Amino acid sequence: YNVARKNNHTGMEISAHFLRTIVVMYKGNPDKGFELFKQIRMIADNSGHELYKQTADLCIAFMYSYYNQLRLVEQWIIDGNPADMHIYTPLKPFYAIVYGRICIDREAYTKYMGSYGIMMQDARVHQNLISIIYLEIYAAISCDKLDMKAEAAEHFKEAVETAYLDGIVTPFVVNGKELANVW
């Protein structure tokens, strides 16, 4: 964080604050984490760049979604239509993760599946494995909830196969409760 701030790297500064927020919140101090959100917002707003403002919105929405605080998420993220939105290209994979989580939390499984194709296309173009894994996990959860068991199993299998080679487990741990019925 200090190196990013000293060298005026706004994107890195936001990322460092986001990682600090995750650690603080996972250690059981959500109040401190929510306070750090204000710093992320201030850094982004002071930058004057839309890219950093979108980054801050997504970082904050990511954490709010895991604390069932969707009322605090920016409306453009909740209402989003990934095919029609102007999201800066570097943010598309992260947007897909956040938007998918919000759809799962809101039980908007059909809406998620309607956006799945365009988000997966973007994730594959940018070769973003984490995004691909999350998209497949959210598709497995959505299909399971829509009583499409074979499709749910296929999406879960795809997520596992994609994650296996690089040993990526976090998306499965974070979504374990919702995945319990899929496997």
Indicate where each model-derived feature is located.
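Amphipathic alpha-helical segments of tetratricopeptide repeats
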Residues: 1-9, 38-49, 74-85, 117-125, ...
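Tandem amphipathic alpha-helical repeat scaffolds
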Residues: 2, 12-29, 52-68, 93-107, ...
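Polybasic, glycine- and aromatic-enriched phosphate-binding surface used to engage nucleic acids
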Residues: 49, 56, 151
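Juxtamembrane segments at transmembrane-helix boundaries
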Residues: 72-74, 90, 127, 143
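A compositional/structural signature marking long, glycine- and acidic/polar-rich segments
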Residues: 85-94, 105-128
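C-terminal non-catalytic interaction modules
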Residues: 111, 118, 125-183
